[in-house]
Curated annotation (Swiss-Prot):
GO molecular function terms attached to this record: ion channel inhibitor activity; toxin activity
Predominant cellular place of this UniProt entry's protein: secreted
Family affiliation: Belongs to the conotoxin O2 superfamily.
Species annotation: Conus ventricosus
Residue ranges annotated as propeptide in the record: 20-50
Keyword field contains Plastid: no
Keyword annotations: Disulfide bond, Knottin, Neurotoxin, Secreted, Signal, Toxin
Protein's cellular compartments: Secreted
Disulfide bonds listed in the record: 51-65, 58-69, 64-76
Tagged with keyword Iron-sulfur: no
Protein name, as recorded: Conotoxin VnMEKL-024
Tissue: Expressed by the venom duct.
Taxonomic lineage: Eukaryota, Metazoa, Spiralia, Lophotrochozoa, Mollusca
Length: 79
């Protein structure tokens, strides 16, 4: 009888641990999904004038839609 009780307790602990782990994974996946859904695509950024197109003058990579600013020419490059 004692062995059965211990076995049931161990099973209950394992199941509750698994439920806690599964809940944590789902929260992380939801956070990732929310993070990526908030980001704009390159086309959306360009359309709204938030970045510069190919070969436009630039000083910093963040100014270009491709995020590649040539230090040699001072212009946005393609990917």
């Amino acid at each position: 009888m004692q062995k059965l009780t211990i076995l049931l307790l161990v099973a209950a602990v394992l199941m509750s641990t698994q439920a806690l782990i599964r809940g944590g994974v789902e929260k992380r996946q939801e956070a990732k999904r929310n993070f990526f859904s908030k980001r704009k695509t390159t086309a959306e950024s360009w359309w709204e004038g938030e970045c510069r197109t190919w070969y436009a003058p630039c000083n910093f990579p963040s100014q270009c839609c491709s995020e590649v600013c040539s230090s040699k020419t001072g212009r946005c490059l393609t990917w």
